[in-house]
Amino acid sequence: MSQLVYFSSSSENTHRFMQRLGLPAIRIPLNERERIRVDEPYILVVPSYGGGGTAGAVPRQVIRFLNDEHNRALIRGVIASGNRNFGEAYGRAGEVISQKCGVPWLYRFELMGTQSDIDNVRKGVSEFWQRQPQNV
């Protein structure tokens, strides 16, 4: 199975979700000056920001990570967290990244996620990678 890459703000909601998920993952640094580069296909797990609009929905650190052509070429899907209080904009970062990178928006969960979200993502990630061609 390939990896997960995620970003979590100082609220640590996405980080807590990833810890509970228990799958191999790399964290995009909170400090914008620190950079990471991935070397295998990945699913991106990202929180949504901005309170409703498209502008500002994707964290700056994630934009910088995806602006690296090497990193962007390896993304295979996106999972987004958000807050249902934002209505239609709930999980908007997933929609934005899916459209801009041409990858499927696989799942969304609220804040730290529920046990059901953890179970769904574990199962969904496993099934997703099983469906992918081996040389992708």
From Swiss-Prot:
Q: Name one GO molecular function term.
A: FMN binding
Q: Which Gene3D superfamilies match?
A: 3.40.50.360
Q: Which GO terms describe its biological process?
A: protein modification process
Q: Which Pfam families match?
A: Flavodoxin_NdrI
Q: Which InterPro entries match?
A: Flavoprotein-like_sf, RNR_Ib_NrdI_bac, RNR_NrdI
Stated family = Belongs to the NrdI family.
Role this protein plays: Probably involved in ribonucleotide reductase function.
Question: What PANTHER family does its record include?
Answer: PROTEIN NRDI
Name of the protein described by the UniProt record: Protein NrdI
Query: Could you tell me which species this protein originates from?
Result: Citrobacter koseri (strain ATCC BAA-895 / CDC 4225-83 / SGSC4696)
